[in-house]
Amino acid sequence: MKEIWLLAESESWDEAKEMLKDAIEIGFDGALVRRDFLERAEKLGRMKIVPIEDAVVKISSAEDQERALQREVVVLKFEDWKVIPLENIVAMKKSGKVIAAVDTIEDAKLALTTLERGADGIAVSGDRETLRKFYEVVKEEGERVELVRARVKEIRPLGVGERVCIDTVTLMTPGEGMLVGNQASFMFLVASESEESEYVASRPFRVNAGSVNAYLKVGDKTRYLAELKAGDEVEVVKFDGAVRKSYVGRVKIERRPLILIRAEVDGVEGSVILQNAETIKLVAPDGKHVSVAELKPGDEILVWLGKKARHFGVEVDEFIVER
């Protein structure tokens, strides 16, 4: 997910403190402060605090670009905002984070999207309203995933097994859910319980995600559903590919009847095992929810396709087959 950091360069602790308090309340991911303010800044709230001197690199020459590539987390500050140096660093930096210091909304949008991938985040300063506007830009731009249409091939009731319910700290809307699957490279958009039902009230914070063995997509990694616990980061995915970050509030693992759903995209097959109940739904290409009780072969649903194999949830270049 894209990050937003506060760049508190003020030599006045009172000014820096006010910006820090605003950034913490708005929900910033981190802050950069003068080294002599570090101890006081860390007492204001739980947020990543980094000394400006350790992270900020001013870019005005090719040599500066080389220095930036050596930092694990680098905040790029351009003497005169230019796209090409940022593109160079984004393209060449293979690990760590690239954060771009920006002054305007236009520069923020450009930094977050350059070379399609964009910087990992932006660093900004200003009053509370300015900080909030930058925050909204970052969350709107956000991450996106490419969802494709898959055709259902098989629907088969199974016996009883353990399934995982993920209760998040976020209220989801119809068309949103999480990417879950038996294969790390083929994941189904499992709908949130954001629709009313004649049987139960809606639970818009919940995704009844699937069997304990299933993978959950979280950024560039995967997690086993059975491993999740309160406080873990998860991703809420919308039918149009928009992604937003959330956190687990509670996980419930219970024994329930299960059903296997198998689907196919251009000859590539994948499957997911869900609870066999009418309130469990997948998401169709138009964003509507489709109950597993009504799903039939030939129906189209949304899935995500990956490319690489994974080792402990991380993408690796190796041969692996999952069925």
UniProtKB/Swiss-Prot annotation:
InterPro entries: DHQ_synth (IPR002812). GO terms for molecular function: 3-dehydroquinate synthase activity; dehydroquinate synthase activity; NAD binding. Coiled coil: none annotated. Its EC number is 1.4.1.24. It catalyses: 2-amino-2,3,7-trideoxy-D-lyxo-hept-6-ulosonate + NAD(+) + H2O = 3-dehydroquinate + NH4(+) + NADH + H(+). GO terms for biological process: amino acid biosynthetic process; aromatic amino acid family biosynthetic process. PANTHER family: 3-DEHYDROQUINATE SYNTHASE (PTHR33563:SF1), PTHR33563. Catalyzes the oxidative deamination and cyclization of 2-amino-3,7-dideoxy-D-threo-hept-6-ulosonic acid (ADH) to yield 3-dehydroquinate (DHQ), which is fed into the canonical shikimic pathway of aromatic amino acid biosynthesis. Belongs to the archaeal-type DHQ synthase family. This is 3-dehydroquinate synthase. The lineage of its organism: Archaea, Methanobacteriati, Methanobacteriota, Archaeoglobi, Archaeoglobales.
